[in-house]
Amino acid sequence: MFVRSNKYLIKLRKILLKKKYQRVFIITGKKSYIKSKANFFFSKVLKKKKYFVFYKKKLFTEIKELNYILNKIKEFKPNLILGVGGGVVIDYAKLSRFFYPNSSIEKKDLFKNYKKFKKLPLFVFPTTAGSGSEATNFSVLYIRRKKFSFENKDIKPNKFFYVIKFLKTCQKKNRASSGFDAISQSLESVFSKKSNEKSLKYSAISIKNSLKNYLHYVKKPEKIHFFKMALAAYYSGRAINIAKTNAPHALSYFFTQKFGIEHGHAVALTFLRFVNFYYKKYLINKSIFLRKRFNFLFKCTNTEDIYQFNRLILNLTKKSGLNTNFKKLKIDLKKNMREILSNTNQQRLKNSPIKIFKKDIRHILFDKCYSNFSSK
């Protein structure tokens, strides 16, 4: 549900005030919970109910903190879980709801086959427009600094609520990063080996909304821009739920973990490089799949060729303040190359339309021709 007016807020209150939800466990981040003023909203709506607010501390979904949350949930015994925050909070909420009533999990638990069983209801309230996690059947979890993706149909939230009032307090830097995440997810999913007619349809809706509204959303957002970017994020989530992301996301996790670069910004560092790599490969092998995907890409983005597409993306990153220059960000690629390669997420990399080897990644990161096809 996209909560755009008081009419929708009344509907939301009615849902939360149902008698069956007497004990509510809220997972959130302290800064976003207070800045978005979600704390005022929930304290008022839930004042006659018992509720517990857990503030996550980690920048990533880590197994130690997840187990701590599971313990707290088991102690509190809720009949409703709420996730209020960005992608990390929503992933914690999804994983917590799925693995409850366990008080802890291990790495092996991510690879078991689970039978369908009744789980606690989960409602999520994104405070950024970007991750699309509210629409996906998977969640990210880090174990000893290594990223894993847990996938199960039953992990998806029962309901999601984009409350425009919560989104309005998101800082410019966060809007730029999370908004580009929505853009990259919808565009990456176009090239995924798993993409199909349905995922392409969702990608097209997301791309149309994000490209028209992204810079307004970052610089001088009005209510309509928050709504349109929330819509773009949601449909990017639906697209990657089918197709998944690929190479730019596969490398992004290292830059976030090692250098503290926000996720969407980290994706932007290599996004154009990989799209240009795909295009160069297409010129060589004349792949029918890539020809169809690039035609779809140019049509959706209203560009005529790879040169115009490059200029479009470069304009978005420049005007939104997303610096994609490794040197200016003080990232020494040569010094960190071994770590970059060892921490590249193979699960995401395998979704790429062509096989990418370690030597390709080195070439893509160092060769300037992949960073910009802006002129013929």
Describe the function of each predicted region.
Residues 257-336:
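Gly/Pro-rich interdomain helix-loop hinge
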Residues 9-10, 34-37, 63, 88-93, ...:
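Short glycine/serine/threonine-rich phosphate/pyrophosphate-binding segments
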Residues 1-80:
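ATP/NTP phosphate-donor binding region
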Residues 70, 89-103, 135-138:
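Short Gly/Thr/Asp-enriched flexible loops that form oxyanion-binding sites at enzyme active sites
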Residues 78-94, 127-133, 261:
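Glycine/serine-rich anion-binding loops at beta->alpha junctions
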Residues 333-376:
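Short, amphipathic C-terminal "tail helix"
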